UniProtKB/Swiss-Prot annotation:
One of its GO terms (biological process) is retinal cone cell development. This is Thyroxine 5-deiodinase. Monomer. Homodimer. May undergo minor heretodimerization with DIO1 and DIO2. Its EC number is 1.21.99.3. It comes from Bos taurus (Bovine). One of its GO terms (molecular function) is thyroxine 5-deiodinase activity. One of its GO terms (cellular component) is endosome membrane.
């Protein structure tokens, strides 16, 4: 009788099949966890988003808009008058946010921008008292890649200012920020990070924006927009966010935001713009820091 040949096993064949199955299972598990995380974040963010959307819808009624914005201005504390070296009155650090009557606030483009900003804020890595994310930035000259903490020198504080030319509060308060640069640059470093446009001409358009700039499609577009800003802030270092918006994502910086970093730690985290973007809070922090270094200085009123 002929003997049947015994089955031959190829060494490693079963191991390779099991390895491939394990890789697929691991990938499926990671995708499932990511999906669950995104779903949970949407459930957390959705009530907040709905509240913002409802407020924008209300503000499209001009009578409500004028009443609410007027009441907000009246509720603000009286601004202390500051004089420059020539005895002239210095404009306030945080002029009130103005919204023209012809601007619609509750549109599909505005809701997309609001959702994008709230999502970045929810997933940001930066938190006050925690380590500062060393996210990637790009030099406008030569497109050389660097990192944010490359601009931190020793124990000196580093002030980060995120924004874009089409953001009215950011541009309205640039002169106040520039005054801080001039006054404290001996002991403090400052860095402007140009991020995606807040109100691009092909997105959420506002007539209050001083410039009409479309959303950036390339680094060249972002450089062109940043050059406009650089003319108004010649004394401050300026870099670009990457086209993947790595710095804006890490710091939750859209529409605009302020941070202070010292020794790799976030010492101050400003609120999200427009309402939370307060140059006066940075000034207060720097005044306290300056007093620690040099003692209290007399203030002229």
């Amino acid at each position: 009788m002929s003997r049947q040949a015994a089955p031959r096993w190829v060494v490693g064949e079963g191991r390779g099949t099991l390895g491939g199955a394990a890789t697929m299972l691991r990938s499926l598990l990671l995708h499932s966890l990511r999906l669950c995380s995104q779903t949970a974040s949407c459930l957390v963010l959705f009530p907040r988003f709905l509240g913002t959307a409802f407020m924008l819808w209300l503000l499209d009624f001009l009578c409500i808009r004028k009443h609410l914005l007027g009441r907000r201005r009246r509720g603000q504390p009286e601004i202390e008058v500051e004089l420059n070296s020539d005895g002239e009155e210095v404009p306030p650090d945080d002029p009130p946010v103005c919204v023209s009557d012809d601007n619609r606030l509750c549109t599909l483009a505005s809701l997309r921008a609001v959702w994008h900003g709230q999502k970045l804020d929810f997933f940001k890595q930066a938190h006050e008292g925690g380590p500062a994310p060393n996210s990637e930035v790009v030099l406008p000259d030569g497109f050389q890649n660097q990192h944010i903490l490359d601009y931190a020198r020793g124990n000196r504080p580093l002030v980060l200012n995120f924004g874009s030319c089409t953001u009215p509060p950011f541009m309205a308060r640039m002169s106040a920020f520039q005054r801080l640069v001039t006054k404290y640059q001996r002991d403090v470093d400052f860095l402007i990070i140009y991020i995606e446009e807040a109100h691009p001409s092909d997105g959420w358009v506002t007539t209050d924006s001083p410039y009409s700039i479309p959303q950036h499609r390339s680094l060249e577009d972002r450089v062109s927009a940043a050059r406009v800003l650089q003319q108004g802030a010649p004394e401050c270092a300026l870099v670009l966010d990457t086209m993947t918006n790595s710095s804006s994502s890490a710091y939750g910086a859209y529409f605009e935001r302020l941070y202070i970093i010292q020794s790799g730690t976030i010492m101050y985290q400003g609120g999200r713009g427009p309402d939370g973007y307060q140059v006066s809070e940075v000034r207060t922090w720097l005044e306290r820091y300056d007093e620690q270094l040099h003692g209290p200085q007399p203030r002229r009123v």
